[in-house]
Amino acid sequence: MSEAYFRVESGALGPEENFLSLDDILMSHEKLPVRTETAMPRLGAFFLERSAGAETDNAVPQGSKLELPLWLAKGLFDNKRRILSVELPKIYQEGWRTVFSADPNVVDLHKMGPHFYGFGSQLLHFDSPENADISQSLLQTFIGRFRRIMDSSQNAYNEDTSALVARLDEMERGLFQTGQKGLNDFQCWEKGQASQITASNLVQNYKKRKFTDMED
């Protein structure tokens, strides 16, 4: 099936999102719980419903608990000025990290957060003392779920995979679709329905980056 737009790869697993990517735009609008460490003048009206304690001068008082979209929280966060502090969403806290370490495959990641890996990677932008544990948990969760995802993509050809895919985060869904497309392309080639097997986009992009590095 052809796509209605040229897909732009997400940059959320790196230091910054790629705002040409629809996935990253959606992820950056997910809410993050924060606490104001200083009064925020002239913003009380904007956060009035979320912050019932807004003062009459339209300032958000110090100590207010808000839920801000990720992009705004990143923009306001400053280690030196301490404008706000970030509270970890429950899915990234120690209790859930313990669940992931026991068996990451039992968790419905899409229900907990459709951009689990990308959003978690962006949390490392903030100076949480749990950053090292979060990054390790993200890595081990991905490793623990990767084999099952790819095995299913290769062994569920022409079968109903909606129940499996419904539990995957958006990045995992992309991997699953890539696996199924690779299998489909191989079977078409095996039946003589394709003239050649082409390299995947991941391999092609890696070669381009490597060639660019050599030129530099």
Swiss-Prot record:
SUPFAM superfamilies the UniProt entry points to:
GINS helical bundle-like, PriA/YqbF domain
Asked whether the keyword Nucleus is assigned, the reply is yes
Membrane-crossing residue ranges in chain numbering: none
Q: Where in the cell is it found?
A: Nucleus; Chromosome
Superkingdom of the organism of origin: Eukaryota
**Gene3D superfamilies named in the record:** 1.20.58.2050
Matching entries from InterPro entries are given as: GINS_A, GINS_bundle-like_dom_sf, GINS_Psf3, GINS_Psf3_sf, PSF3_N
The Gene Ontology biological process annotation of the record reads: cellular senescence; mitotic DNA replication initiation; multicellular organism growth
The record's principal subcellular location, in a coarse class, is nucleus
Q: Keywords of this protein's UniProt record, alphabetized?
A: Chromosome, DNA replication, Nucleus
* Region of interest (Not essential for folding and stability of GINS complex, but may regulate accessibility to the central complex pore), residue spans: 1-16
What is this protein for, i.e. what is its function?
Answer: Required for correct functioning of the GINS complex, a complex that plays an essential role in the initiation of DNA replication, and progression of DNA replication forks. GINS complex is a core component of CDC45-MCM-GINS (CMG) helicase, the molecular machine that unwinds template DNA during replication, and around which the replisome is built.
> Which family would the database say this protein is a member of?
Belongs to the GINS3/PSF3 family.
Q: Known PANTHER family for this protein?
A: DNA REPLICATION COMPLEX GINS PROTEIN PSF3
Which proteins does it associate with, and in what oligomeric form? Component of the GINS complex which is a heterotetramer of GINS1, GINS2, GINS3 and GINS4. Forms a stable subcomplex with GINS2. GINS complex interacts with DNA primase in vitro. Component of the CMG helicase complex, a hexameric ring of related MCM2-7 subunits stabilized by CDC45 and the tetrameric GINS complex.
Its recorded name reads DNA replication complex GINS protein PSF3
Species annotation: Homo sapiens (Human)
Query: Which lineage?
Result: Eukaryota, Metazoa, Chordata, Craniata, Vertebrata
